[in-house]
């Protein structure tokens, strides 16, 4: 059990059968009702962000999340196969659990898969990945005065905004958390 006074960003807790990670929290004192802790939490199953207020001194169950290094192997219908890097055991993850992550996955990419017991909670991608631009319109010199952006499609079909000088076939660095262009590779 974890007391609300021990809350910190990144802590995983279980509330009403749901598993949350604390995104941020704020202690606030009121004259009559005592201290309250306002938290912003992400549900690890649904990915929704929720705000929950706890009373000071409340205790919640700590959720132990195991992070295991895996390698993405291939897609098989609506499932995607990953291999444990230590035991070589293969697991299948349903497409619905990793819809956003599919925009950046490619064969042999090393990721971390989060487990709550035997349940797969999510996939952690590296923060930045080098990916190839499959299609973009050519930029014309003198098009703009400022740093204008254009659309570029990655191999997965994911659309990212890139500067005008990026061409089809170039490798770029993409921030997987925000899904944005960082720089040329």
Swiss-Prot record:
Domain of life (superkingdom): Bacteria
SUPFAM superfamilies the record matches: Nucleic acid-binding proteins, Translation proteins SH3-like domain
Any GO BP: peptide biosynthetic process
Pfam families in the cross-refs: EFP, EFP_N, Elong-fact-P_C
Disulfide bond residue pairs: none
Chief location category: cytoplasm
Pathway: Protein biosynthesis; polypeptide chain elongation
Family annotation (InterPro entries): Elong-fact-P_C, NA-bd_OB-fold, Rib_uL2_dom2, Transl_elong_fac_P/YeiP, Transl_elong_KOW-like, Transl_elong_P/YeiP_cen, Transl_elong_P/YeiP_CS, Transl_elongation_fac_P
Keyword terms of this UniProt record: Cytoplasm, Elongation factor, Protein biosynthesis
GO molecular function: translation elongation factor activity
GO cellular component terms, A-Z: cytoplasm
Subcellular location: Cytoplasm
Function: Involved in peptide bond synthesis. Stimulates efficient translation and peptide-bond synthesis on native or reconstituted 70S ribosomes in vitro. Probably functions indirectly by altering the affinity of the ribosome for aminoacyl-tRNA, thus increasing their reactivity as acceptors for peptidyl transferase.
Family indicated by similarity: Belongs to the elongation factor P family.
This protein's name: Elongation factor P
Protein's organism: Acholeplasma laidlawii (strain PG-8A)
Annotated gene: efp
């Amino acid at each position: 059990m974890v007391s609300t006074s021990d809350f910190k960003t990144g802590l995983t807790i279980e509330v009403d059968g749901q598993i949350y990670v604390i995104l941020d929290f704020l202690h606030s004192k009121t004259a009559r009702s005592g201290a309250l802790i306002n938290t912003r939490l992400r549900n690890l199953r649904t990915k929704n962000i929720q705000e929950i207020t706890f009373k000071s001194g409340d205790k919640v169950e700590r959720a132990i999340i195991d992070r295991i290094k895996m390698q993405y192997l291939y897609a098989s219908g609506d499932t995607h196969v990953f291999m444990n890097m230590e035991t070589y055991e293969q697991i299948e993850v349903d497409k619905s659990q990793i819809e956003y992550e599919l925009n950046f996955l490619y064969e042999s990419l090393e990721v971390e898969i989060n487990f709550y017991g035997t349940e797969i909670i999510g996939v952690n991608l590296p923060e930045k990945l080098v990916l190839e631009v499959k299609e973009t319109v050519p930029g014309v010199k003198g098009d703009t005065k400022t740093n204008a952006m254009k659309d570029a499609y990655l191999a997965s079909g994911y659309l990212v905004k890139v500067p005008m000088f990026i061409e089809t076939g170039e490798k770029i660095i993409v921030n997987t958390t925000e899904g944005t262009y960082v720089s040329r590779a």
